[in-house]
């Protein structure tokens, strides 16, 4: 035998298996995938009846954000509802309680509702340019000298 056959599991199989295991155990990922499969995207495409290349970005966002509708529509609806409620509170302010307490509670309600709707993204990492170029020629020569002293 000229070539020895490797024994064990290949690295690609390990990566695929671990990815599938993580996906199966993570409830958020399962929810996103099941939402994607059940046809959230199909409903949007059937409404438009055309496939537009500009919708690809929105479809990817929707698939990974887990929301069924666009967040802009939801925010518009919540703003209209809060304006209606705020108008009602102004009408009844003299009858029940001072207006100041109503506006504070309304502000708290809209803040918590806005926090619930906003997707949470990781903060971007900003590198300085010096940190990007750490493997210059001198560094490589020092590493080679450390590995093979005397050359």
UniProtKB/Swiss-Prot annotation:
Domain of life where this protein originates: Bacteria
Biased composition (Polar residues): 40-57
Region of interest (Disordered), ranges: 40-125
Organism of derivation: Bacillus subtilis (strain 168)
Protein name as it appears in the record: Uncharacterized protein YhcM
Biased composition range(s): Low complexity: 83-110
């Amino acid at each position: 035998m000229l070539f020895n056959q490797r024994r064990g599991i290949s690295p690609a199989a390990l990566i695929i298996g671990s990815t599938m295991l993580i996906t199966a155990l993570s409830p958020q990922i399962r929810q996103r995938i099941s939402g994607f499969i059940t046809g959230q995207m199909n409903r949007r495409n059937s409404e438009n009846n055309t496939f537009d290349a500009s919708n690809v970005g929105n479809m990817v966002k929707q698939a990974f954000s887990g929301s069924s509708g666009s967040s802009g529509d939801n925010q518009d609806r919540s703003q209209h509802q809060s304006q209606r409620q705020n108008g009602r509170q102004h009408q009844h302010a003299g009858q029940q309680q001072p207006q100041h307490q109503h506006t504070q509670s309304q502000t708290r309600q809209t803040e918590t509702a806005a926090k619930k709707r906003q997707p949470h993204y990781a903060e971007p990492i900003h590198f300085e340019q010096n940190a990007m170029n750490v493997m210059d020629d001198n560094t490589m020569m020092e590493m080679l000298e450390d590995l093979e002293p005397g050359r």
